[in-house]
Amino acid sequence: MVIKLGGVLLDSEEALERLFTALVTYREKHERPLVIMHGGGCLVDDLMKKLALPVVKKNGLRVTPADQIDIITGALAGTANKTLLAWAVKHDINAVGLCLGDGNTVSVTPLDAALGHVGKAEAGSPALVQTLLAANYMPIISSIGITKDGSLMNVNADQAATALAATLGADLILLSDVSGILDGKGQRIAEMTAQKAEQLIAQGIITDGMVVKVNAALDAARSLGRPVDIASWRHADQLPALFNGVPIGTRILA
């Protein structure tokens, strides 16, 4: 099972406490191994503000010029990754902090020259992660990738999680601030097909970063040939059930 963490989760001690408590509860009761995938957009935005650097997004993806990729790598593969690792240590979970490039776990190529150092993620080699899981470690993987020519790349974490799930043949959960996809009245949609998603995007109900999230989930469901869950980390008591396959947010159907 791949669990992708997003939103302000990394900024909130209360949220991290809830999440890691749920992870401990799950691991005590269930055998299926977990892999954590994370971005850290809020953290990067804060850092950019402190350094007075512009934040530019194009179709929900962060434009990453050559003079910013080192900073973004430091925030995601450094601060965000090691913060999550620290929480795992605090909760007695044996974890290992990685990026997409470790063991070529996720293969990354440049996505679009106009976006700069932004990578496209595709399935890579499962060997390293499988070795760690077999030894009972929980991998925590940041969305920084490395191309074949050694360039660092910022990868959208939803898309990275999809490629990671494809690499491992695993189920995927996209955890964020929202309890799923909402309709025009703010009500949670329990199940979503590609047709329904296209309709809501055309109507302007699904917008901005949520378009990227929904498209990533649809791509994942199609490429994995299995449903993908979008859910909120806020419902901590429901998380162990979610990690065991019970939908609590929006289930994206292939």
UniProtKB/Swiss-Prot annotation:
This is Acetylglutamate kinase. Belongs to the acetylglutamate kinase family. ArgB subfamily. One of its GO terms (molecular function) is ATP binding. Keywords: Amino-acid biosynthesis, Arginine biosynthesis, ATP-binding, Cytoplasm, Kinase, Nucleotide-binding, Transferase. Its EC number is 2.7.2.8. The record marks 4, 213 as: Transition state stabilizer. Catalyzes the ATP-dependent phosphorylation of N-acetyl-L-glutamate. CDD domains: AAK_NAGK-NC. Homodimer. GO terms for biological process: arginine biosynthetic process via ornithine; L-arginine biosynthetic process. The lineage of its organism: Bacteria, Pseudomonadati, Pseudomonadota, Gammaproteobacteria, Enterobacterales. Pathway: Amino-acid biosynthesis; L-arginine biosynthesis; N(2)-acetyl-L-ornithine from L-glutamate: step 2/4. Substrate binds at residues 40-41, 62, 154. GO terms for cellular component: cytoplasm. SUPFAM superfamilies: Carbamate kinase-like. It catalyses: N-acetyl-L-glutamate + ATP = N-acetyl-L-glutamyl 5-phosphate + ADP. It is found in: Cytoplasm. It is an enzyme of class 2 (transferase). ATP binds at residues 177-182, 205-207.
